[in-house]
Amino acid sequence: MDRYQATFERLAAQKQGAFVPFVTVCDPNPELSLKIMDTLVQAGADALELGIPFSDPLADGPTIQGANIRALDSGATPDICFDLIGQIRAKYPDLPIGLLMYANLVYSRGIENFYQRCAQAGIDSVLIADVPTNESAEFVAAAEKFGVHPIFIAPPTASDETLKQVSQLGGGYTYLLSRAGVTGAETKANMPVGDMLAKLEQFNAPPALLGFGISEPEQVKQAIDAGAAGAISGSAVVKIIESHLNEPDAMLTALANFVSSMKSATQK
């Protein structure tokens, strides 16, 4: 069975939502990044959302831009990232793993080659932040050819037509934006999202995970109470990495504590 579907069904049976942390692979370096991803899963993450380092991350605020710079400075390449992700996949065969990235990285490898490499590494889904549904045909075709879910963003300003496309084209989960703008924990997530969730359900969309500005357990609880299948937290996780760069043990402990507190807020 599909890993996302299996995870959402298991969580529903346990009356829980999903908590999904985001990190940039190879931040702050490949060796520690592997430990970070492992720590997130051990602490209770239901899935991982991973960034491949890129020199010009348009939709990201300063926190995730910093992660990209650290990773690139440590010598990160897409191949090193795929190798690390493959190691996490081997250790956690049932864990949904998604990429969140930019089209340039896909184009530079060739669209088909890129998705084939994702499939080889055991990646379940790819969200390309700068490709809207109406420009996505080539990406969706390649993703589906290699058994990778194409993920789409449902922004708060979306028309019914956009939400319909997101629902029909997407697989795995739907990335529901809690607000417009760039990523960052400084800007709190806006609730309510009930109307959006009702429309996505009406269009039979994949389960919605709420992202952007999720940094506290209370926000996770609100997202799930509103009807989302779970929440994604990126900048808040990366901030913990950023603030413990010289003390890896303290970093891993702080990450574990954060994930565990966010995960405990998913119980319905």
UniProtKB/Swiss-Prot annotation:
GO cellular component: cytosol
Family assignment from sequence similarity: Belongs to the TrpA family.
The protein's annotated pathway: Amino-acid biosynthesis; L-tryptophan biosynthesis; L-tryptophan from chorismate: step 5/5
Catalyses which reaction(s): (1S,2R)-1-C-(indol-3-yl)glycerol 3-phosphate + L-serine = D-glyceraldehyde 3-phosphate + L-tryptophan + H2O
Name this protein carries in UniProt: Tryptophan synthase alpha chain
Biological source species: Vibrio vulnificus (strain YJ016)
Keywords: Amino-acid biosynthesis, Aromatic amino acid biosynthesis, Lyase, Tryptophan biosynthesis
CDD domains, per the entry: Tryptophan_synthase_alpha (cd04724)
Active site location: E49 (proton acceptor), D60 (proton acceptor)
Highest rank taxon of the organism: Bacteria
Record has RNA-binding as a keyword: no
Classification via InterPro entries: Aldolase_TIM, RibuloseP-bd_barrel, Trp_synthase_alpha_AS, Trp_synthase_suA
Described purpose of this protein according to its UniProt entry: The alpha subunit is responsible for the aldol cleavage of indoleglycerol phosphate to indole and glyceraldehyde 3-phosphate.
Assembly mode: Tetramer of two alpha and two beta chains.
GO molecular function annotations of the record: tryptophan synthase activity
EC number assigned by the record: 4.2.1.20
Record-linked HAMAP family: Trp_synth_alpha
PROSITE patterns to which the protein is assigned, alphabetical: TRP_SYNTHASE_ALPHA (PS00167)
The keyword Metal-binding is assigned to this record: no
